[in-house]
Design a protein with these regions (language model features):
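Conserved glycine-rich cofactor-binding loop
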Residues: 13, 20-21
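C-terminal substrate-recognition "lid" of short-chain dehydrogenase/reductases
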Residues: 79, 117-120, 132, 215-244, ...
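Substrate-binding pocket helix/loop in short-chain dehydrogenase/reductase
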Residues: 96-97, 101-109, 135, 207
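Active-site helix of classical SDR
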Residues: 120, 156, 164
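Alpha-helical segment proximal to the catalytic Tyr-Lys
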Residues: 125, 168-173, 235
Length: 251
């Protein structure tokens, strides 16, 4: 008989970056619904809205070493453990290569790659200590294929894919490291991507139609994949990149 999911993460302690909205917020809500306690981290002050008995909020810049150190310390101070890290924070850029500025390039690398690396580095000693640590990196289909206007973004997400594989090999068997690669998601990220696009609704319809399932993913659906990779149900999986893209990359 299948075990219920309601308490599959009971006792687990997680750090979730980019937690104030979208996939990050949905992940915090799902992990806590399944029994986990969470350090919810974001630069956006809205992260404070998530505070409750199971969640402690941390405001900070994901790409600053002190933020990563504080997140790990807070997990131990408030919940006396650290089992899971979800590297979700990220920035998007839709701009042709020749129009991409030095500042654009540096900022995407800083947030998308440096931020994830710092949180992995600072958390790995604690994750490895108890022998069942889990890291879930939020990559993208853009890290596995080329897409027009996404040179900087594709490069950073490709780095996340390779970081995932490298850490999985380096830290097995005590820490499992996996990634989820979403396609287009109906969140603020999509709003950011379409900023300045004249006919937003027509563009959204076109983007949805490009996915075989015919729609954008919901934040809650990506959170389900993250929760799976953070749970004992995925105990044989490490170094994997799970495509959660409505079939986009199967074409």
């Amino acid at each position: 008989m299948a075990e219920p999911l309601s308490d599959e993460l009971a006792g687990a302690v997680a750090i979730v970056t980019g937690a104030a909205g979208g996939v990050g917020r949905a992940t915090v809500e799902l992990l806590t619904a399944r029994g986990a306690r969470v350090v919810a981290e974001d630069l956006n002050p809205a992260v404070g809205e998530l505070e409750n008995a199971q969640v402690v909020a941390l405001r900070g810049d994901v790409a600053e070493p002190d933020t990563a150190r504080r997140a790990v310390s807070l997990a131990h101070e408030r919940f006396d453990a650290l089992d899971v890290v979800v590297n979700n924070a990220g920035r998007f850029l839709l701009k042709p290569t020749i129009e991409t500025t030095d500042g654009d390039w540096d900022e995407l690398l800083r947030v998308n790659v440096r931020g994830a690396f710092l949180h992995c580095r600072e958390a790995l000693p604690a994750l490895s200590e108890h022998g069942d640590g889990r890291i879930v990196n939020v990559a993208s289909i853009s890290g596995t294929i080329g897409l027009p206007g996404q040179t900087a973004y594709c490069s950073t997400k490709g780095a996340i894919v390779q970081l995932t594989r490298q850490l999985a090999i380096e830290h097995a068997p005590r820490v499992r490291v996996n990634a989820v690669a979403p396609g287009a998601i109906d969140t603020g990220f999509m709003d950011e991507a379409l900023a300045g696009v004249p006919d937003r609704e027509a563009t959204l319809t076109s983007v949805a139609a490009a996915h075989p399932l015919g729609r954008l993913a919901r934040a809650e659906e990506i959170a389900e994949v993250i929760a799976f990779l953070a749970s004992p149900r995925s105990s044989i999986i490490t170094g994997a990149v799970l495509m959660a893209d409505g079939g986009f990359t199967a074409q």
